[in-house]
Regions:
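Catalytic histidine-centered segment of alpha/beta-hydrolase-like enzymes
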Residues: 413-427
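N-terminal targeting or regulatory segments adjacent to alpha/beta-hydrolase or S9 domains
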Residues: 1-164
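Alpha/beta-hydrolase active-site loop
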Residues: 257-278, 284
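N-terminal cap/lid segment of alpha/beta-hydrolase-fold proteins
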Residues: 144-191
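Short, surface-exposed "cap/lid" segments of acyl-processing enzymes
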Residues: 177-195, 204-251
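Hydrolase active-site cap/lid region
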Residues: 301-361
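Acidic catalytic loop of the alpha/beta-hydrolase fold
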Residues: 384-389, 416-417
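Short beta-strand/loop motif that positions the catalytic acidic residue
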Residues: 373-375, 380-382, 386
């Protein structure tokens, strides 16, 4: 039966009733009350819908602000439960920490203490017991280690290249329109090139003609890049490790928020120019996480791209839309809030609400779609267990450009922890790739 039929029949019936029954004061009051209730009900429905839309918009804006807002200090996230420095057992000194996904992960890590001022290096998992993980204690911190709170980190090398690695370095400034960006410069090793087993050969580049420019990820610091410096140093590549806008030790841009690579590539371009001005003829770009997104933007948007010889990406953000949708699901945001937040990034009128200086074109940051624009050889290292930047877009990019992209999965590694999980393999893969392309 058509939707209009019952309504019409009811209307006719109501009219017939009105004609038959007298309408007194009580009936009129009841009718007025019913009309008011109906009016308030309709207004309430509209208000509820408006409130729901406002709530979704608010959630979307809050979500995006958390993504673009730099975080320079992170809270402690693990507890040290016990420390055995005597090493009476076969495993030597050990430390017991609360168990979770990160403390169970294989490899080498650090416990950051006192707000990151001290660090204890830990190694393999010795055993797991009720709610706790016992790991090798490779290097206790100065001042000792005792039960208490700490922060778990994959940035094993804490400090600068000299204090953390024993490599001579210079503190330099990279000139940009925003001001000087601090950077570490590590000269190449002189003489014989040492390469990991399985990567025999030489770069054939004497005199530092090829430099490496290393770019850290979102929320990290230049220390994240130090894991790669010893290998690159042995391969004869001078290393330049710059900060970029909105880092704690770098000038902020006007809004003080990340551009997700859409603006930061200009700072890495300035670092490449610094290298070219100081003796480099070509560069290798190495980027972690958002640093990978930054590197990819430079490789296609900068006039210096023709001086880039090769690219190494570790856990890179290949498609920001995929990463943001994944983050929204992890944070249990309504589907509409996540999608709206992504759409808001590109809207000029949402800049003030989101705290960004310019709209961010997420489509321009999708390298699966833009795969045919790549012109440089890429080594792409990623882990299937990465729960921050999913591996899917990296796999799709590698499948789209097998002529340029060499893809290597690191089972069991978490986000940007490929080196931590298997440093020997990481160095072997990077050395083999660079020796082939330099």
């Amino acid at each position: 039966m058509p939707w209009g039929a019952p309504v019409a029949a009811a209307g006719c019936g109501l009219g017939a009733v009105r004609r038959r029954l007298p309408v007194g004061p009580v009936a009129r009051r009841r009718a007025r009350t019913a009309a008011r209730v109906a009016a308030w009900s309709g207004a309430g429905a509209v208000a509820a819908t408006s409130l729901a839309a406002a709530a979704v918009s608010g959630l979307a804006a809050f979500f995006v602000r958390q993504v673009v807002r730099p975080v320079h200090e992170r809270p402690d996230d693990v507890r040290v439960l016990a420390v055995d420095l005597e090493g009476a057992g076969p495993d030597g000194p050990v430390v017991t920490v609360t168990a979770d996904a990160q403390t169970r992960a294989p490899g080498r890590y650090v416990l950051l203490l006192d707000g990151g001022r001290r660090a204890a290096q830990v190694g393999r998992v010795v055993r797991e017991e009720r709610g706790a993980v016992v790991r090798e204690l490779l290097a206790p911190p100065e001042g000792g280690l005792a039960p208490g709170s700490a922060r778990w980190s994959g940035t094993v090398h804490v400090g600068d290249p000299t204090s953390a690695l024993g490599l001579a370095h210079e503190d330099v400034r990279v000139a940009t329109p925003l001001g000087g960006l601090p950077a570490w410069f590590v000269p190449a090793a002189r003489g014989r090139r040492d390469v990991p087993e399985g990567g025999a050969g030489s770069t054939g580049r004497e005199g530092g003609a090829v430099w490496a420019v290393l770019v850290h990820g979102r929320g990290a610091t230049r220390e994240e890049c130090l894991r790669a410096v010893p290998l690159l140093h042995r391969l004869g590549l001078p290393c330049l490790v710059p900060a970029y806008r909105n880092d704690a030790d770098a000038p902020p841009e006007s809004a003080g928020h990340y551009g997700l690579g859409d603006t930061e590539w200009l700072d890495v371009e300035a670092a490449v120019l610094h290298a070219l001005d100081h003796g480099a003829r070509e560069v290798v770009l190495v980027g972690w996480s958002m640093g990978g997104a930054i590197v990819l933007q430079l490789a296609t948007r900068s006039w210096t791209a023709d001086r880039v010889r090769a690219v190494v990406l570790d856990s890179p953000v290949v498609d920001w839309r995929d990463v943001l949708e994944h983050a929204a699901r992890r944070n249990r945001l309504p589907w509409a809030a996540g999608r709206l937040g992504i759409a808001m990034l590109a809207r000029p009128e949402a800049r003030a609400l989101l705290g960004v200086s310019a709209p961010i074109d997420v489509a321009r940051l999708d390298w699966v779609v833009r795969a045919d624009e790549l012109r440089l050889p890429v080594l792409l290292l990623h882990a299937a267990d990465d729960d921050v930047v999913p591996i899917g877009p990296s796999r799709r990019l590698a499948a789209a450009r097998p002529d340029l992209v060499v893809f290597r999965d690191f089972p069991g590694a978490q986000h940007t922890k490929e080196w931590n999980t298997d440093p020997e393999r990481w160095e072997r893969e990077v050395a083999r790739f660079l020796l082939e392309h330099l």
